[in-house]
Amino acid sequence: MVKLESLKKSYQFKKALKERKIHTDYFSIFASKNFFKPKYKSNLLISFVMKKKIGNAVKRNKIRRKLKANVQKLLKKKGAINRDYTYIVFGKSNAYTQKQDVLLPLMEKSFSKLKK
């Protein structure tokens, strides 16, 4: 089983934000080649970030949970997410009202674009 490992240091975020990016109405995904090793080889380096302007903590956490659940579903599909990359997913306020079923194909399409 693949576990999600979060980025911890600011230099990790800065490096990941400089490379590839994809924007949608519900989230933005930033990706860069793995520049440091995850704790375990099977882990995926990914962080979920929300702006404080989105709303209170309940709203931000709900968006984070939706996006994280979609990533978990995509990890079960073979080859949907490349584990050789470090990802940062910025949630947007539109994702709060949107159903998870709508977000999943968008996220899958975004991750496939980042592979190219």
Role assignments for model-derived ranges:
Residues M1-K116:
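Positively charged, solvent-exposed patches that mediate nucleic-acid binding
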